[in-house]
Amino acid sequence: INGDWCSIYIAADNVEKIEERGELRAYFCHIECQDECRNLSGGDRIMRNKHCCVGLSFRLDGVCQEFTVVGVKDEKSGVYITDYVGKNYFTVVESTEYITLFSNIIVDEKGTKMNVVLVAAKRDSLTEKEKQKFAQLAEEKGIPTENIRNVIAT
């Protein structure tokens, strides 16, 4: 999982949040895995014990802003927990040499849950098989395939 990654597709059951100016439109930069993947570090390459640090860029009001999202891994469930636009519970669903699939449940301040899935890659496109795998993950999480957005194109 170590290295430079690029967000390719994102999908959510609340599609407005991931549209081009949506607060959850995420652009991955870099991910590092340490300590048997209890520690992930991203973007700005901050290393933190038993945390997941993912470097992300979000476009807010049309301006791209960089963030480091730090998640603490729950050792029992394997889920990373962080705060960004609510409480986030995310997992690395699958990681290969070329792609990494993420699943995230976000609970906002009102208690509303939203499912988000994202695929990041080491290249700027996916194979048809990888696209199908991502669409299948979205469907498994109750996200309609029409809610899939191509992030690399923006």
Show the residue positions of the predicted features.
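A beta-rich soluble binding module of mature secreted/lumenal proteins
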Residues: 1-154
